[in-house]
Amino acid sequence: MRVNITLEHKESGERLYLTSKNKRNTPDRLQLKKYSPKLRKHVIFTEVK
């Protein structure tokens, strides 16, 4: 079962990226390294409920 999730960078509060994940295969929170235009570098974005 795939669900849509939002990715947020905790320090800057940016919520830029939308993606989907399979809850059965990844039950814990997803963390992806993405580009932050505000900081102009790659940082870790974490799944937000």
UniProtKB/Swiss-Prot annotation:
Top-level taxon: Bacteria
Entry protein name: Large ribosomal subunit protein bL33C
NCBIfam families: PRK00504.1, PRK00595.1, rpmG_bact
GO cellular component, one term: cytoplasm
Gene Ontology molecular functions: structural constituent of ribosome
TM annotation in the entry: none
GO terms of biological process kind: translation
Gene (name only): rpmG3
Pfam families in alphabetical order: Ribosomal_L33 (PF00471)
Family the entry assigns: Belongs to the bacterial ribosomal protein bL33 family.
InterPro entries membership: Ribosomal_bL33, Ribosomal_bL33_CS, Ribosomal_bL33_sf, Ribosomal_zn-bd
Keywords, alphabetical: Ribonucleoprotein, Ribosomal protein
